[in-house]
Amino acid sequence: MAENSSTRHPVVRIEVRIQVGPNLMSGTDDPLFLGLRGAAGREFRLKLAHGGSLRRGREGHFVLGAPNDPATNVEPPELNDPTNPTLDANAISSVYLRKGLEPIPNVRGLGEMDDRLELEAVAVEISVADEPKPRRFARRGPIWLGLVCGLLLEIPSVDEAI
């Protein structure tokens, strides 16, 4: 990791927990991205290195960190590394989830190529060097993501949570 001397609050790890809803067709195998807004903005793919996709009624736990961090569980870790280039946590204004699309034939007859995702709860923790507690963002549902209901979900800081 190349440390940027101007980064005063370097991000060392990001953890994302997603509780998938209990309803029929709540889960998805479509790509999902965590986005950071602000001057340090970028997106990260939430894809587990081992295991399946987001399944109905289950929790997905994604850890983004340096490739040599044993807790990192996303694939590919070197392309989804929040430590390289170094991100300044103070330059992150908010976070969001964005659902991508991998078209599959739709058997529901809605004339779309979509695999929806029902979110019961989303929690994001951004761990920062030399800070005892992570910076937290959270949102509760149920909220659906998909072509017929929108692909992006803003996740406020817990101080602003709705």
Map each language-model feature to its residues.
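Regulatory, non-catalytic segments
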Residues: 2-162
